[in-house]
Amino acid sequence: MANDIDELIGIPFPNHSSEVLCSLNEQRHDGLLCDVLLVVQEQEYRTHRSVLAACSKYFKKLFTAGTLASQPYVYEIDFVQPEALAAILEFAYTSTLTITAGNVKHILNAARMLEIQCIVNVCLEIMEPGGDGGEEDDKEDDDDDEDDDDEEDEEEEEEEEEDDDDDTEDFADQENLPDPQDISCHQSPSKTDHLTEKAYSDTPRDFPDSFQAGSPGHLGVIRDFSIESLLRENLYPKANIPDRRPSLSPFAPDFFPHLWPGDFGAFAQLPEQPMDSGPLDLVIKNRKIKEEEKEELPPPPPPPFPNDFFKDMFPDLPGGPLGPIKAENDYGAYLNFLSATHLGGLFPPWPLVEERKLKPKASQQCPICHKVIMGAGKLPRHMRTHTGEKPYMCTICEVRFTRQDKLKIHMRKHTGERPYLCIHCNAKFVHNYDLKNHMRIHTGVRPYQCEFCYKSFTRSDHLHRHIKRQSCRMARPRRGRKPAAWRAASLLFGPGGPAPDKAAFVMPPALGEVGGHLGGAAVCLPGPSPAKHFLAAPKGALSLQELERQFEETQMKLFGRAQLEAERNAGGLLAFALAENVAAARPYFPLPDPWAAGLAGLPGLAGLNHVASMSEANN
């Protein structure tokens, strides 16, 4: 009985929900199928009842209070600000809340009145005591400057070839931005939190306000509403922290390779410079370590850790043990966030080649399509292809992008900015790879070569188009006239004839087409053997009477065609004179000179001289 029932197969469509939401947003902007009109301070907002009821409990109660026929079309709301309602509507259709330090209070009040709890929680976390807006604005400006530099570097590499190192820097820079949705909430510290906070309170004053208990940067539970928070559970492997580490350090054990020397005296001789907000300060404020119970597993043999380096760098750091650090899911993301670029404010710079070697090369698997993503910061970017999230929007044409650097490049179309200038001809370009392709015109470099015909190209897409056509793999005839050696050989021998070094003549093409009507006379020409003379066979011979008859037929056809053309035109003496002139023209007879010289000395072809005299008389 169970075998008769077909097994149900569930086929998921991850992008369906986001596509439906995007379609509803387009309908809202175009005013299509909108069944409710919200009026706030003489500003009208057309929207859909179902979307509002799904996001707000207030609208759900309002729209389900009576029958649909009794509900009005226009609702006037006087308890919210227009900017706050516009931001909430944008959140309802795009799942992205755009707020500023000035309108966060208005959005909080509107979310409370409309009963949207998730927006209320986010606004309360942003307005936490100690998180003043001035400090956030300063950090936002600094981070934007860093983003501009890093995005310029990334743009140069991603269009020509995808570089995992640039993707890691881009993801880390996006994490540095003080997004209001990424600011963690304040929770009551646990017993282990007091231990770590006490340890951080004894650290040197080089890192002020970063490790003090009760500050916004104290260690607590990570809570954010970005896409990364959806991926943390059962995604990052738990990091096994060695028990031998005597002090708390945010660095992974494998951060320093085995090939590094153990003596770091050269770094310790550099003078210490005070930092207003170092990279570690920013990391610990925005990314906080949540402590859990440590799994009782035998730790692997630890690699050598340069403790002497930290002793020289932090001479005032107390050497007492601070307690074991518990492993957790978020610790892997915390370690992947660190890179040599972000630690540049703390440690002296080293060569770029070694810096690239130190960057983490983590591999993560997509939980939806199970594709292995190489690079620490590429998985959240890959997840946006499934969720359809596009958090960056153009303020002019309202086109959305998944990445901030793509939005910056798109804005150049509106501003007309062309930052890349050619030093030879002063040509300007929007993209750096366009400048590289243009520079090859001046340098003559063709780096892309076909492996079949060895033809070189200046651009990779030209090579791909050439290979796709497969024009270099197939044999094709030459265009235009054949070389002189080929024409001479074709006059002497046929396709299956002997080699060109043997003396023989073959019938020209004009004579070969009308051949096969040999009369009584035969023409014999010198050749390799008597059996291969072309007039020895009946098919290749031609009589003199047939040649004269064909010449007369050609003259009559040309004369009749000229008369028809003269009658078709607007007649007159001029048209008749032109027709007579055309009729009197001698037709071309394709008989080359070598044949005339070769046939003149033969007694059986004396009639050909009569044909030549007739053509001369016509001239």
UniProtKB/Swiss-Prot annotation:
Residues 34-101 form the BTB domain. It comes from the Eukaryota. Residues 129-218 are annotated as: Disordered. A zinc finger (C2H2-type) spans 364-386, 392-414, 420-442, 448-478. Detected in normal cervical keratinocytes, and in some cervical carcinoma cell lines. Residues 133-173 have a biased composition (Acidic residues). It holds the Pfam family zf-C2H2. One of its GO terms (cellular component) is nucleus. CDD domains: BTB_POZ_ZBTB7C_ZBTB36. One of its GO terms (molecular function) is DNA-binding transcription factor activity, RNA polymerase II-specific. GO terms for biological process: negative regulation of cell population proliferation; positive regulation of fat cell differentiation; positive regulation of transcription by RNA polymerase II; regulation of transcription by RNA polymerase II. Residues 191-208 have a biased composition (Basic and acidic residues). May be a tumor suppressor gene. This is Zinc finger and BTB domain-containing protein 7C. The gene is ZBTB7C.
